[in-house]
C-alpha cells in the first residue's frame, strides 16, 4: 500500500481522505501544533487514526524518505525551496502532487484543472536535470 506524505498538512484532510478512500498509510507534517491536534482529532472522528500520523515539525527538516506519494499545498517559493529535498530523499518514480502551485522550472508531467483549481503532478526522475539541481 502507498505511504502518502502531506507536507504542510493543516487539518489533515488530504491524509485522512487517502486513508479512508484508498486504505493508504499517511503522514502529515505540520508546523502549527494546534493544527496537528485538530488533524489528530479529525482522524479519530473519521475512523482512520490507525492508518495516519501527524507530526509537528518543520517540513524542511522532516525525513520523508519512506513516502511513495507526496502532496503539497504550498506557495511556489516554498515548493521551489523544497525541491532539492524531494530530489534528495525520494526514490525515482515517486509522484509529487501540488494543489494550485507549480515548481518553477521543473515542468509537471501532468496538469489537471478541477473545478477552478489546478493540480500538478511530477515524478522524481532517475537523474536530476542540471538546471534543477540547486
Report residues per predicted region.
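Gly/Ala-rich phosphate-binding loop of Rossmann-like dinucleotide-binding domains
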Residues: 19-23
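Conserved SAM-binding motif I beta-strand of class I
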Residues: 25-30
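Conserved class I S-adenosyl-L-methionine
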Residues: 2-10
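S-adenosyl-L-methionine
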Residues: 37-66
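Glycine-rich SAM-binding Motif I of class I
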Residues: 12-16
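C-terminal substrate-binding/active-site "lid" region of AdoMet-derived donor-dependent transferases
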Residues: 77-134
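A short SAM/SAH-binding and catalytic strip from SAM-dependent methyltransferases
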Residues: 65-81
Amino acid at each position: 500500500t502507498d505511504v502518502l506524505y502531506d507536507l504542510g498538512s493543516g487539518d489533515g484532510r488530504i491524509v485522512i481522505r487517502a486513508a479512508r478512500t484508498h486504505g493508504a498509510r499517511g503522514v502529515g507534517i505540520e508546523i502549527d501544533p494546534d493544527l496537528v491536534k485538530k488533524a489528530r482529532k479529525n482522524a479519530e472522528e473519521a475512523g482512520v487514526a490507525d492508518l495516519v500520523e501527524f507530526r509537528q515539525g518543520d517540513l524542511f527538516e522532516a525525513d520523508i524518505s519512506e513516502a511513495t506519494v507526496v502532496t503539497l499545498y504550498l506557495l511556489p517559493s516554498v515548493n521551489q525551496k523544497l525541491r532539492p529535498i524531494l530530489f534528495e530523499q525520494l526514490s525515482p518514480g515517486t509522484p509529487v502532487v501540488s494543489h494550485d502551485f507549480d515548481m518553477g522550472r521543473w515542468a509537471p508531467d501532468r496538469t489537471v484543472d478541477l473545478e477552478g483549481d489546478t493540480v500538478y503532478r511530477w515524478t522524481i526522475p532517475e537523474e536530476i536535470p542540471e538546471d534543477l539541481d540547486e
